[in-house]
Amino acid sequence: MIGYNDFISYSDLANVAKYYKKIINPIQSGKNDALILYTSGSSGNPKSVLLTNENVLASGIYIKNTINLPQTKGDKCLCFVPFKYPYGFATSVLLTMMCGRTVVLVPDGLNKENVKTILPKINYYYGSPALLDVLKNIVSNDVDLSLSHTFVTGGDFFTEKTEKMGREFFANHNCNNITFCNGAGNAETVATWSSSVGTVVRPNTVGRILVGEEPLVVNSETMQEVKYNEEGTLLIRGKNVFKGYYGSPELTKHEKVNINGKEYYNTRTVGKLSEDRFFSLTGRESRFYILNDGNKVYCEKVQNFISLLDIVESCVVVDKPDDCTRYTGKAYVVLKDGILPDENTRNYIFEQCTKKLYNTNNEIIQLNSFEVPTSIDFVDKIALTEADKIDYKKYEKMAEEENENDKKNKRRIKIK
């Protein structure tokens, strides 16, 4: 078998030649199927995304043209995301190699022993913010991370708090110049459509829309284009947009839209696009609920607001069924060390949700009265999926079960 030794011999090449019974013709092969990636299913059922050779190559070219990486040999990138997810295989591995970097894989995971030999050589880190928690728990004080310079996240967002925690961690390991980069993407765009790497890192954005892609932000109800810096749903057009969902032509048709004679992929991502192509992600279409008065609540917006509070480490917001308003907001909150999970703390969070806050850009952030959650539970940590994304389905199920229990308790009270 080829690949079990460090070197490939001429005999190995001969075996490869014998395996192919006909000439490999690269001409017109761009539309050929290349691989199938699976969405993480963090907020729904996983989908099988069929990508062509052209999709993968175009994505690599778009990234290289966007991030302007210098021709540096020897840079090593740590991939910490499972291969079955797009961010793990397509972005962290294939696109990294297309950019001329070396990929370091850890199929058996990181532990207190192997990090001593692996991490000192790493320059780039690919993973969700959950990777920081892993590193904090297993990296001893004597491990030198001075060669580290970039941490690229996908799946979940680096908040101001997680970035601050990350800087403190790397500073304790001789690295004071680490850059944290938020990015965003879908499996349908080979796992990425924006990047902060190699460009100016603008707070509260996921970086620039890749050069080569054609973005369009629209009103999700009318599908009419909105102005720059107005909130809407992001559509993407480009050669990196997937061929379709494997075996699901109707689903493919549903996710691709035609506007002015051009076909776009609907990312279902809500945010604002600036004139210089920076995108501020404010939510996802799949993560909202509509009240009986017609008001729409985006869970990400509420979640990000609560995460800014001085006593909150992190939080998750989901919809909870309600007989009167259809839904209410349910927040699961991880408190900072030393903060008591009592009623006073709960009331403090409710009170802050009615006030104005300022983000790092000194912009005012405020919730509407109908966006304020009606109940808060304190948890020790946020549950994650295998892809290191927040397990929204788990929290949605918990909220549904709580609603059912509330109904049962009300019935018991009436019987008494």
Predicted feature descriptions by range:
Residues 1-30, 151, 401-404:
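ANL superfamily adenylate-forming
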Residues 25-26, 34-61:
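Conserved AMP-binding A3 loop
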Residues 33, 39-42, 50, 77, ...:
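Conserved S/T- and glycine-rich ATP-binding loop of Class I adenylate-forming
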Residues 57-76, 84-126, 137-139:
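Conserved AMP-binding/adenylation subdomain of ANL enzymes
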Residues 122-127, 136-203, 214:
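Gly/Ser/Thr-rich phosphate-binding loop
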Residues 208-212, 224-255, 295-297:
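Conserved ATP/PPi-binding loop(s) of AMP-dependent carboxylate-activating enzymes
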Residues 238, 243-244, 254, 263, ...:
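AMP-binding/adenylate-forming catalytic core of the ANL superfamily
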Residues 289, 316-322, 330-332, 350, ...:
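Conserved C-terminal "lid"/linker of ANL adenylate-forming enzymes
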